[in-house]
A protein has these predicted regions:
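Surface beta-strand/loop "capping" patches
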Residues: 1-10
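Short, flexible loop/turn segments at beta-strand junctions in immunoglobulin-like
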Residues: 75-77
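Hydrophobic residues positioned within well-ordered beta-strands of beta-sheet architectures
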Residues: 17, 45-47, 71-73, 84, ...
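Contiguous segments within soluble domain cores/interaction surfaces
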Residues: 5, 14-16, 20-61
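Aromatic sugar-binding surface patches on proteins
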Residues: 63-72
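Extracellular Ig-like/FN3 beta-sandwich strand-entry sites
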Residues: 14, 79-83
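Short acidic/polar inter-strand loop motif in beta-rich domains
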Residues: 88-98
């Protein structure tokens, strides 16, 4: 099951895209409450959003991004039937991807 949830809402001449990613986003400075050992860094490094295979958002995230990041933006000219794809890569080499059709 994907860690990514995508929602879209058509407005007059644009589409609102909302993305929620379930990810720990650990920066590596927190201690485990039981063992008092540092929790290793684990965060999303690169996030890419495409619409019909054309990149519309590409960003580098880091260890200061909070747990379970939420992103929202307006997509000009997004129309019903367009395919939104979200991909991420984290610092441990894990990847995830999810597709969504604008309704």
């Amino acid at each position: 099951m994907s860690s990514i949830k995508i929602r879209s809402k058509r407005l007059k001449e644009s589409t609102q895209i909302r993305i929620l990613i379930a990810h720990p986003m650990e920066h590596g400075n927190n201690q485990d409450k039981i063992t008092h050992q540092l929790i290793p860094a684990h965060f999303i490094r690169i996030l890419t959003v495409t619409c019909n295979q054309k990149v519309v958002v590409s960003c580098e995230m880091g260890d200061s991004t909070p747990k379970d990041p939420y992103l929202a933006f307006m997509l000009k000219h997004g129309k019903t039937g367009d395919k939104i794809t979200v991909n991420w890569l984290d610092n441990l080499g894990n990847i995830d991807s999810e597709e969504h059709i604008i309704n």
